[in-house]
Structures are given as C-alpha cells and as structure tokens.
Amino acid sequence: MLKLPLSYSTFGLTKLSVIEAIHAVADAGYEGIELAFHKTHFNPFNITDQLLGDIRAALRERGIVPACISSPTHFFTDERPHEPSLFCTDIAGRKQRIDLIRRAVKVAQAV
C-alpha cells in the first residue's frame, strides 16, 4: 500500500523562497511537502526551468517527497476564494483556472 508521507505546505512559509521553504520543512522533520503556488512565493507564471531544477535538487538533497502541487484558492481574487473556479459561468474565468491547473500538472511532472 502506498503511504503518503507526513507533509507540510509551503503556503505557510511564503515569506521564504520556495527553496528555503523546502529546507525549513526538512529541518522541521517532515518527510513530504506540498508545493503551493503563491503570487510572490512560487508564482506559476514565473517558474523557470532553472528553478524547477533547483527544487528537484533541494528535494533530493533533503530527502523530501513532493506530495502535492497546490493551485491556489486566492490566486486571481482575494475577495472570492476559489474563483474563478472550474464551475465559473464566465468562460474566460474558467479558462484561467484550467490554465492554472495545467501549470500545476506540468510542475508536478517536472519535480
């Protein structure tokens, strides 16, 4: 049976860089990490191949398992969590969410 490691989300560490957050999670004794998109901390629209390589290296170095990539709930609007959602009646808004989820899948494949 597949065991999901006890993990911590980088969403709670947004004042650190994503690399610093990986080290902080490892230092705290967690086995896994949720890499959470955040406008200033881990912005899916600004992720480079270099950063993905650095993330892979930090995870490997610290023995941390990436448990999840989180697409944010407040990424597009602070006033309405989860909007635009996949159920948004506005087609352009729904396409924004779909694009964000696709970016999360690509990041998951890369790390």
Predicted regions and their residues:
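N-terminal pre-domain/capping segments
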Residues: 1-110
